[in-house]
């Protein structure tokens, strides 16, 4: 139900043809405060997530290409998970502006941004699930994993995963539309009139593909991993499991509330739940859990840094390299100025190398 819509009534509409009488019809569920809440809090929160999510996941992509060079199936899955997070990040400026004002970007971007949102959602949880399967094969079926956990199979399964995510997101692309109502432009999913079937199918799709199936697979994988590690203690394996386990737990913790709230919203749309106070709280919950889900985009790089020793080493090397380039550029600028002022300068390359070495 649109927050600004007036509920249907069984009274004859002709009685209320007069404008003032029509406006005086009591609205069963006013939600102006909910929109004001979103206008105030969502744009700054989305901006923070955009900045930190973009920086963190860009660093992960750089590390994977520059240092790890995608040598294994795990590297391929980590790269694709970072790309999934970046899809969310790139959509946030649009949603932030939309929350503060209205949709001004047209129908094309409305469909594209909504589609990016869903593709990022599905692909993200699919790759977290694949990472759990990858750890399961590496630890529980170590011999078989030597043949199965190859770079080639990693690329093939990643392409298949993206295909499934894109296909699952098509309804969001097809049914997202722009419309203007009471001088306010919206970008929302609108189904045909009285079409409850699509609403139910959409909710079931998100909850089954986005929660039930992945959660079942992850629980199976980690129960078998824990069972195996009880008989085989290996410090490196334990650290790898901690990192992947943290990714899984945080993903479920940040996305499960949103899935539950979406399911409850569907029940409201189907008029299974009809209570004004409950609807208002549900709208607040949608904004809160959706923002919580977006925050997840920033967390995976932090997990890699604190739990992955190699990642921590590579990230520090990357920052040292960037710092060295920055210092080098500073010295290049100083050298040009100094050379222009004093043509007989004795500032040599070896001197600059020594200074750069000291800076690093």
Swiss-Prot record:
Glycans are attached at residues 183, 194. InterPro entries: CCR1-9-like (IPR050119), Chemokine_CCR4 (IPR002239), Chemokine_rcpt (IPR000355), GPCR_Rhodpsn (IPR000276), GPCR_Rhodpsn_7TM (IPR017452). It holds the Pfam family 7tm_1. In natural killer cells, CCL22 binding induces phosphorylation on yet undefined Ser/Thr residues, most probably by beta-adrenergic receptor kinases 1 and 2. SMART domains: 7TM_GPCR_Srsx (SM01381). Keywords: Cell membrane, Disulfide bond, G-protein coupled receptor, Glycoprotein, Membrane, Phosphoprotein, Receptor, Transducer, Transmembrane, Transmembrane helix. Residues 1-39, 99-111, 176-206, 268-284 are extracellular. GO terms for biological process: calcium-mediated signaling; cell chemotaxis; chemotaxis; homeostasis of number of cells; immune response; inflammatory response; interneuron migration; positive regulation of cytosolic calcium ion concentration. GO terms for cellular component: external side of plasma membrane; plasma membrane. Disulfide bonds join 110-187. Predominantly expressed in the thymus, in peripheral blood leukocytes, including T-cells, mostly CD4+ cells, and basophils, and in platelets; at lower levels, in the spleen and in monocytes. Detected also in macrophages, IL-2-activated natural killer cells and skin-homing memory T-cells, mostly the ones expressing the cutaneous lymphocyte antigen (CLA). Expressed in brain microvascular and coronary artery endothelial cells. Belongs to the G-protein coupled receptor 1 family. This is C-C chemokine receptor type 4. The lineage of its organism: Eukaryota, Metazoa, Chordata, Craniata, Vertebrata. The gene is CCR4.
């Amino acid at each position: 139900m649109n927050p600004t819509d007036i509920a249907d009534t069984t009274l004859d509409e002709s009685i209320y043809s007069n404008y003032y009488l029509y406006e005086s019809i009591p609205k069963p569920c006013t939600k102006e405060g909910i929109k004001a809440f979103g206008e105030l809090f969502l744009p700054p929160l989305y901006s923070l997530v955009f900045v930190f999510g973009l920086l963190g996941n860009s660093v992960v992509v750089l590390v994977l290409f520059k240092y790890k060079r995608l040598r294994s199936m795990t590297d391929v899955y980590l790269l694709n998970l970072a790309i999934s997070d970046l899809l969310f990040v790139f959509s946030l400026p649009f949603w932030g502006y939309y929350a503060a004002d209205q949709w001004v970007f047209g129908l094309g971007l409305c469909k594209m941004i909504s589609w990016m949102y869903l593709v990022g959602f599905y692909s993200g949880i699919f790759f977290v699930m694949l990472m759990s399967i990858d750890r399961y094969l590496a630890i529980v079926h170590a011999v078989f994993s030597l043949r199965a956990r190859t770079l080639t199979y990693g690329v093939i399964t990643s392409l298949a995963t993206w295909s499934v995510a894109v296909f699952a997101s098509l309804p969001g692309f097809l049914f997202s539309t722009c419309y203007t109502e009471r001088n306010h432009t919206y970008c929302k999913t609108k189904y045909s009139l009285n079409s409850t079937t699509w609403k139910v199918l959409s909710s079931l799709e998100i909850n089954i593909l986005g929660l039930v199936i992945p959660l079942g697979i992850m629980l199976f994988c980690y129960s078998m991993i824990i069972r195996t590690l009880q008989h085989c203690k290996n410090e490196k394996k334990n650290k790898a499991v901690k990192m992947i386990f943290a990714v899984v737990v945080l993903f479920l913790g940040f996305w499960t509330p949103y899935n539950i709230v979406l399911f409850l919203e569907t029940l409201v749309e189907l008029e299974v739940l009809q209570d004004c106070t409950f609807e208002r709280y549900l709208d607040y919950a949608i904004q809160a859990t959706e923002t919580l889900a977006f925050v997840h985009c920033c967390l995976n790089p932090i997990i890699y840094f604190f739990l992955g020793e190699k990642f921590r080493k590579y990230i520090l090397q990357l920052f040292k390299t960037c710092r060295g380039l920055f210092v080098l550029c500073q010295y290049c600028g100083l050298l040009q100025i100094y050379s222009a002022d004093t043509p007989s300068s004795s500032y040599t390359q070896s001197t600059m190398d020594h200074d750069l070495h000291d800076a690093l």
